[in-house]
Amino acid sequence: MRQLCRPLTLPHWWQDALLALPRIVCGYLLAANFGAAKFGLPWSPPDNNLGLFEVAFWFPQDVAAYGGIFALFPNFFAWMGAFSEAIGGVLLVLGLLTRPAALLVCCTMLVAMFMQQWQQGLWNMLPAAGFLWAALPALVLGSGRFGLDYLLTKPAVPRLRPGLVALAVAALLLPGCVQPAHDKTVVYLLDVSGHPNVQQVGLRGRDKPLSWDSDLLLTPIRKDSLYRAVVTTHTGYKVTEVKFTLNGDFELKEKANRRILFGPADTTVYRARFDVVPR
């Protein structure tokens, strides 16, 4: 273990500092943003409702769509991918277990590039490719002078016992699970009175079956006045985000999306006026 973690140091300290910069920035972005959004950490967004070390409910579904072995074990690969980003990012920042963390990040980014983003063109592959290139020097060189590995692998530091390392890893892995998801129904009641020439009233949103690309049409209760839609979402989140459209045009342009908080019951009623900012 000590040999695996012992970093290679360059002749001058500033060279190690220069190589530590992309490692630390990469790790911070993964741990604080990309990973924390789908893997339960103390700083994960509260609205995502993730328990500690839980992977977001939607991620195994995305992984299963890759096919092959990913479809056979979607929960495992989803959890490992999210773990690699979130916990691997923390380890990269600290320079602790740097090579294993960098290996996990590299594998995850390769999967993201070729299984998820390949069909969407080279431009969409750039974020994952950027994390891959940032992790590669850490995979080869370790943490350099600027990391905990440099301190912990010095001869004066007591050797880590493999049993204790295995116990720590097991303690970290055991709580991991997939976030539970439930059907949540929202009844949308939209007042469009005062808006002339109402031909079509739609709803777009973040969570399936809604999308930001196409309208779910609302049904008129009182034509040119009150419209209604009932949407059931299978989710583990506490909130969803939507916007209404009128004749294909978005409301609240250049303003934040509407945030609907799911109530404790399975059905929530949401009343709104078109293009009026909710209080």
Per-range role (PLM):
Residues P46-F70:
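Perimembrane loop-to-helix junctions flanking transmembrane segments
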Residues M1-L52, L72-F83, I87, L94-V178:
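Extended, low-polarity transmembrane helix blocks
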Residues C177-L189:
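Bacterial Sec signal peptide processing site at the extreme N-terminus
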Residues K238-V242:
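Exposed beta-strand face motif in extracellular beta-rich ectodomains
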Residues G194-Y237, N247-G263:
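Aromatic-rich carbohydrate-binding modules that target alpha-glucans
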Residues L50-G51, Y188-S193:
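Aromatic/hydrophobic beta-strand junction motif of beta-rich domains
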Residues Q179, T268-R279:
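Compositionally biased low-complexity segments at domain edges in trafficked proteins
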